[in-house]
Structure formats: C-alpha cells, structure tokens
Design a protein with these regions (language model features):
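Helix-helix packing/entry segments at the starts of transmembrane helices
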Residues: 48-49, 90, 104-111, 175-198, ...
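Membrane-interface helix-cap regions at the ends of transmembrane helices
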Residues: 29, 33-36, 40, 54-71, ...
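C-terminal-most transmembrane helix of multi-pass membrane proteins
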Residues: 2-9, 49-51, 219-221, 255-296
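Glycine-/small-residue-enriched transmembrane alpha-helix faces in small-molecule transporters
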Residues: 2-48, 91, 151-178, 199
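Specific transmembrane alpha-helical segments of multi-pass solute transporters/efflux pumps
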Residues: 25-26, 30-31, 59-109, 145, ...
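Transmembrane alpha-helical segments that form core, pore/gating elements
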Residues: 58, 116-118, 122, 136, ...
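Juxtamembrane helix-loop-helix junctions in multi-pass membrane proteins
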Residues: 25-55, 101, 171-195, 209, ...
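Hydrophobic transmembrane alpha-helices of multi-pass small-molecule transport proteins
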Residues: 58, 111, 119, 128-150, ...
Length: 296
C-alpha cells in the first residue's frame, strides 16, 4: 500500500512537471509576440483586446462544460488572479517593451520562479526545504547576471516596469495555483478572464484605433497568439502543473522561459544567440533539477 501511494505521488508530481513544462514553452512566445504587436498596436489597447478575445473563449468553455459558478469565498482570489495575470502582467510588459528590447525584457522572467515561490509560501502555505531556496536564488542570479552581461538598459523605466510585472505575475501564479486545487486548473483562468470582462471589453471598444487597415499580418498573428495561447491555453497547462507538482517546485521551470524566449526572439526578431546563452542555460537547468529535488 505504501509503495502504491508513493508511486501515485511520484506519478502526480511528474505529470505536474510535464504540464508545467508545456505551459512554460507556450509562455515563452509571449514577449516576442507582444514586442511584434506593440510596434503597431497601442499597448493598453493590446492588453485589453487580448483579454477580451480570451474571455469570450473562456466564457464559451465554461458554458459548454456547464461549469458551476465559483463559491462566494473564491471570487476575491479570482480577482487577484485577474489583476495579476489577465491585466497586470500583460499591461506592464507591453508598456515595458516600448522602452526595452524583447531580449532584454525576457531575461527578467528569470526572476519569476523566485517571485512565485515567495508568494507560494505567503499565500499557498508551502514550506520548501532551505536547499531549495539556495538553488532558486542561484538560478535567479545566473539569469540576472546574464542580463547584466548583455549591458545595462538605457531605459530604467522599462526595467522598473518589468520588475513590477514579475511581482504581480508571481502573485497571480501562486494565487491561481492555490485556487486550482479546489476549482480546477482551466476553470481558474477562465473565471479570472470572466471577472475581467466588465473592465477589458468596454476599454477594448473605447481604445480601438479609428482604422485597422494599416495593421500587418504579423501584428494580427501576434495578437492572436497572446490572446489564445498566452492568455488561455498556456494557463490551462500551467495551473494544472502547479497544483499537481507544487507551486514552488514546478515554478522553477520558469527559469527556462527566458532562454526559450530568447531562442524565439532570435528566430522571429533576428537577434543573435550567443555561446553565453547556451552555457547559462545548462547551468540554469541544473538549478531547476536541484530545486525539484529539494522542493518538498
């Protein structure tokens, strides 16, 4: 019986890491796609429009599967998720990308695991072992060191916006993961999108440009990606992974996101991928493995 119980726990944890990894891969395209989109869309309109599109599909999913409304005590946590990942993070990153390059902004995402783990402790009641924090801090330092090695930003406003984006996103991730244990992974992001509808839908209409005739196909495709994949599909996998494998543990997979994102930026925006990126990626993978081992 004990052996079966251990196997089920291990299997659930492994599934959590797989789901979390899929979510990270999807999220990795968010900043390069946003960078392409803000070249032609106003950043505030882009944020509201991506949430509006995603919320329509979210409402459709909830209706098709006849999901029950959340309990009264779940609406406030859903509001926190909505403010963090539906509005806060997309808006702050879109504004930041007016000041800094896609590659520069991506490396700040390396701080997300630490932010998620901190809020996982504060909001989710998790208690990782001390060695976990060592690997988490080391991974974050490696990513930030890589960012600094590329040169300090000439636009501190962009850096500040990215740091704020990381904080609100970490809070939204941790709150959503905690809520997904009782509400369900995809249900959390869907209801969070629905909560945001009274704000994002009217603003999308109000802030819409007078004409869309000058918008290129890459900009439209980027809007579609951040609306459907970054805002909805990615979270289905991500929240399920966090709930299965633990917020602090699976959250360490975010350390890989900057490097996936840089690879996409190189392909989409023709930015150079250096040997240093490859070396730091290997080191960060080691930190992720160490964090996973000592997370519980």
């Amino acid at each position: 019986m004990d052996r079966t119980s251990r196997f089920n726990t291990l299997d659930n944890s492994t599934q959590g890491w797989i789901n979390g990894f899929i979510g990270v891969v999807i999220f990795s395209g968010s900043l390069p796609a946003t960078r392409l989109a803000v070249m032609e869309f106003d950043p505030v309109f882009l944020t509201m429009m991506r949430a509006t599109i995603a919320s329509v599909f979210a409402l459709l999913l909830l209706w098709l599967f006849k999901e029950k409304r959340p309990a009264r005590n779940q609406w406030v946590p859903l509001g926190i998720v909505s403010l963090g990942v539906v509005i806060g993070f997309p808006l702050l990153t879109a504004l930041a990308l007016q000041y800094v390059t896609s590659a520069h902004s991506i490396v700040f995402i390396g701080l997300l695991p630490l932010a998620t783990a901190l809020f996982g402790v504060l909001r989710g009641g998790e208690r990782p072992r001390p060695v976990f924090w060592l690997f988490s801090m080391l991974g974050s330092v490696l990513v930030m060191g890589y960012a600094l090695a590329q040169g300090l930003s000439a636009a501190p406003a962009g850096d500040l916006l990215m740091l704020l984006a990381v904080l609100v996103c970490g809070l939204g991730y941790a709150e959503g993961a905690k809520l997904s244990r009782s509400l369900g992974g995809w249900q959390v992001i869907c209801w969070a999108l629905v909560v945001a509808m009274p704000v994002v839908v009217p603003l999308s209409v109000t802030l819409a440009p007078a004409s869309f005739s000058g918008i290129s196909l890459p900009a439209w495709l980027s809007l579609g990606y951040v609306a459907l994949f970054s805002m909805l599909i990615g979270f289905v996998f991500w929240y399920r992974g966090l709930a299965q494998g633990g917020i602090a543990a699976v959250g360490q997979l975010q350390l890989l996101q900057p490097f996936f994102g840089l690879a996409l930026a190189a392909g989409l925006l023709h930015e150079q991928v250096s040997l240093g990126m490859v070396l730091v990626t290997v080191a960060v993978i080691g930190c992720v493995a160490g964090a996973k081992k000592f997370a519980r």
